[in-house]
């Protein structure tokens, strides 16, 4: 009997050893997932596994001591009794007799954060310890024994999670933070008051900032902003809107705002009245309120409510973009006839058929969604298995998708095909190569602007500019390249000759190699003089509601002291995610009765996107009805300005711009948006030679520095200036002809037979 009892006791001890080994050897992954049965940890018979780990201060908390083969020591029994009492206290706390945030420290857990008995949950562990028992803190009857075991199991899981997280934060803190960020991103929800494209607009506004900005000279980007420098900038920003906007919309100042800066803006006005202190006492509130008052935006949503700076400025940017008053009254007060388009007003009042227009727009959406093409998915196959190492094995069947963007790309390929090329003459640009930025982009002779100013003096009549006019447009555009150093005089001669009220520049002012500075930067700069007695002066800078554009008022003085006024709108419209700014500038130009000048670097990319979108919009408003109005608009534009719309990205952007303009009629095209995001993801994997630190990645730009769609054309011969005729007798026996030249195209007529 003694032998049997001894064997039974040893079996119990071995069971305790194996159970302790499994509990101690559980991996971090099982702790985080709540699974304590980890198959990766093998049980062991080593008695050392009974020692708590990790050991605290090098002393074991509990070790089994044997006085004989069959009895345990008295100290061991005391410790077992203490564990039982501790377990009983934990059950009492589980039933609601303790604080919510106080949890028991698991045996062997690190004690560097709190007392050994109790531990307060850290905020860093909220993402790991996120599950709570469904009935926790809500049980009114503590006598329900059925829920105690479930609550006990959940409590043990939480304890083990905390223990694992604490241990991991000591050993691998970077891994824990990375896991937390991944979980936060997975569960993140976009706030309703934020603008999805606000960051891109903010980045574009920073790009469009002044090159000689006073803020930039005081606080370089790579220099740390001190408290004294920040206080000086706040004092200077009270009277300077440009510095105020730089402080509010530059991310390096986000953490520098203090509540005491509000007192700087609490000055008395001319009447001696002191402004009311806002409920939101953060330091950036009063400066942002001054910006809102300047543009007529209601600021109570952040002055009376405590929200963060990022959310407030995103909402202000969106409200500035949605503002209907995008024009200044400077031109309308001086030349009211220049900003009143009688042709458009007459059509909208008397000729517009709203029902027919709505049918055209609905047909446009239906044709865009139905015009799909099969696109091969790169690197994916149905039978992606190679058997053996034979040179000639079974062919792999590629995967294809039927996509809307694929249909647009196919339409662009049809436009680029030499069969649809329209031959034109360009002798004037060939004779003035020094005035052309790119010799391969020719200027069409029949639509080019011939300079005739000044009368009686021949200074040359060539400028790389074309007139875009005729139905369905309501106004006239003049598309040109960015002025060069030797073409600034020709540019202003054209502006004076055509009586242009608006000049739209769609490139950055920080790239002098892509566009010459052809206007006075500030009112204090000297005027620009042009041969023929023309003088251009800066009359002031207007802060437009649209944060992307910088508006300069220019006064032109002619040879007979005649004065004309021009508004110069400059903005780097290169972000394909921004739909508001292009439509705002088109609304401004649509109401002009005189020709307006619009240019980018070569005059065939961003400017072409805006003009093509305007042609398609007017075509849907006025008619006639086309099955593919955007394709027809690009053909219409290329008949007047060849080489317009260079890449599929720009062609797709025109479709999205037109669909966004008619969103109140046709609703949102979710299928197009989803397909476009998928296409952007594939486009991001292509090679773009852009700055990795740029706020807008290269694959989202309309005209990046090195577009893969254009780079592949480098080294190829120039497109032949003739149209290839498609054979009209395909599938029939050819008739006999007298000569070979009657059936061969000019490219093949040089072959010898």
From Swiss-Prot:
Q: Which Pfam families match?
A: Y_phosphatase
Q: Which residues cross the membrane?
A: none
Q: Which organism is it from?
A: Caenorhabditis elegans
* Stored InterPro entries: Oocyte-zygote_transition_reg (IPR052782), Prot-tyrosine_phosphatase-like (IPR029021), PTP_cat (IPR000242), Tyr_Pase_cat (IPR003595), Tyr_Pase_dom (IPR000387)
Q: Which CDD domains match?
A: PTPc
Q: What GO molecular function annotations does the UniProt record carry, in alphabetical order?
A: protein kinase binding; protein kinase inhibitor activity; protein tyrosine phosphatase activity
Q: Which UniProt keywords apply?
A: Cytoplasm, Developmental protein
Q: What is this protein called?
A: Inactive protein-tyrosine phosphatase egg-4
- State what this protein does: Inactive phosphatase which acts redundantly with egg-5 in the oocyte-to-zygote transition. Required for the polarization of cortical actin cytoskeleton rearrangement in the oocyte before and after fertilization. Together with egg-5, required for the cortical localization of kinase mbk-2 and for the inhibition of mbk-2 kinase activity in maturing oocyte until the end of meiosis I. Also required for kinase mbk-2, pseudophosphatase egg-3 and chitin synthase chs-1 localization to cytoplasmic foci after fertilization.
Instruction: Family membership, please give it.
Output: Belongs to the protein-tyrosine phosphatase family.
């Amino acid at each position: 009997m003694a032998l049997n009892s001894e064997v039974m006791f040893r079996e119990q001890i071995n069971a305790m050893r194996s159970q302790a080994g499994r509990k101690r050897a559980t991996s971090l992954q099982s702790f985080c997932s709540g699974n304590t049965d980890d198959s990766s940890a093998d049980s062991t018979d080593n008695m050392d596994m009974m020692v708590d780990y990790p050991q605290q201060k090098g002393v074991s908390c509990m070790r089994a001591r044997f006085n004989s083969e069959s009895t345990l020591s008295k100290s061991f029994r005391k410790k077992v009794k203490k564990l039982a009492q501790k377990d009983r206290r934990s059950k009492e706390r589980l039933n609601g007799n303790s604080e919510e945030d106080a949890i028991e420290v698991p045996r062997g857990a690190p004690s560097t954060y709190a007392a050994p008995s109790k531990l307060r949950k850290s905020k860093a562990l909220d993402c790991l310890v996120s599950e709570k028992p469904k009935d926790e803190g809500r049980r009114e009857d503590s006598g329900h024994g059925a829920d105690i075991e479930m609550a006990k199991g959940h409590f043990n899981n939480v304890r083990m999670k905390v223990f694992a997280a604490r241990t991991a934060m000591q050993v691998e803190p970077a891994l824990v933070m990375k896991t937390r960020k991944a979980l936060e991103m997975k569960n993140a929800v976009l706030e309703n008051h934020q603008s999805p494209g606000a960051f891109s607009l903010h980045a574009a506004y920073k790009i469009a900032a002044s090159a000689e900005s006073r803020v930039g000279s005081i606080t370089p980007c790579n220099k740390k902003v001190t408290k004294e420098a920040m206080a000086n900038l706040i004092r200077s920003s009270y009277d300077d809107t440009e510095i105020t906007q730089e402080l509010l919309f530059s991310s390096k100042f986000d953490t520098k705002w203090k509540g005491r800066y509000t007192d700087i803006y609490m000055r008395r006005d001319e009447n001696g009245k002191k402004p009311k202190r806002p409920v939101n006492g953060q330091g950036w509130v009063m400066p942002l309120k001054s910006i809102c008052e300047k543009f007529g935006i209601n600021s109570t949503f952040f002055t009376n409510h405590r929200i963060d700076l990022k959310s407030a400025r995103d909402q202000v940017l969106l409200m500035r973009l949605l503002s209907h008053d995008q024009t200044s009254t400077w031109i309308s007060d001086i030349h009211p006839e220049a900003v009143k388009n009688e042709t458009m007003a007459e059509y909208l009042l008397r000729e517009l058929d709203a029902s027919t227009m709505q049918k055209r727009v609905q047909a446009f959406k239906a044709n865009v969604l139905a015009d799909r093409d099969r696109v091969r998915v790169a690197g994916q196959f149905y039978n992606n298995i190679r058997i053996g190492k034979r040179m000639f094995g079974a062919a792999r069947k590629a995967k294809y998708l039927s996509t809307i963007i694929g249909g647009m790309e196919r339409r662009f390929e049809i436009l680029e095909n030499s069969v649809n090329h329209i031959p034109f003459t360009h002798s004037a640009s060939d004779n003035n190569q020094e005035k052309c930025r790119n010799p391969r982009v020719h200027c069409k002779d029949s639509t080019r602007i011939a300079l005739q100013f000044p009368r009686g003096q021949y200074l040359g009549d060539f400028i790389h500019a074309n007139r875009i006019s005729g139905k369905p447009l309501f106004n006239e555009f003049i598309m040109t390249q960015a002025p060069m150093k030797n073409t600034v005089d020709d540019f202003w001669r054209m502006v004076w000759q055509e009586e242009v009220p608006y000049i739209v520049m769609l490139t950055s002012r920080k790239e002098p190699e892509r566009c010459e500075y052809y206007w006075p930067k500030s009112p204090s700069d000297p005027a620009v003089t042009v041969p023929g007695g023309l003088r251009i002066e800066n009359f002031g800078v207007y802060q437009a509601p649209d944060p992307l554009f910088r508006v300069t008022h220019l006064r032109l003085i002619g040879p007979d002291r005649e004065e004309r006024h021009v508004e110069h709108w400059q903005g780097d419209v290169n972000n394909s995610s921004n739909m508001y700014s292009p439509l705002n500038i088109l609304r401004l130009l649509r109401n002009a009765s005189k020709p307006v000048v619009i240019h980018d670097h070569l005059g065939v990319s961003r400017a072409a996107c805006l003009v093509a979108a305007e042609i398609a919009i007017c075509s849907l408003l006025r008619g006639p009805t086309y099955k593919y109005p955007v394709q027809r608009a690009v053909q219409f534009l290329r008949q007047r300005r060849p080489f317009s719309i260079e890449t599929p990205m720009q062609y797709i952007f025109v479709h999205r711009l037109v669909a966004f303009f008619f969103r109140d009629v046709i609703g949102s095209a979710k299928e197009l948006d989803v397909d476009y995001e998928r296409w952007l993801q594939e486009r991001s994997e292509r090679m773009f030679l852009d700055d990795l630190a740029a706020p807008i990645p290269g694959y989202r730009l309309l005209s990046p520095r090195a577009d893969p769609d254009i780079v592949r054309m480098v080294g190829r011969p120039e497109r032949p200036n003739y149209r290839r005729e498609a054979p009209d007798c395909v599938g029939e026996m050819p008739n006999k002809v007298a000569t070979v030249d009657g059936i061969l195209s000019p490219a093949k007529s040089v072959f010898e037979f």
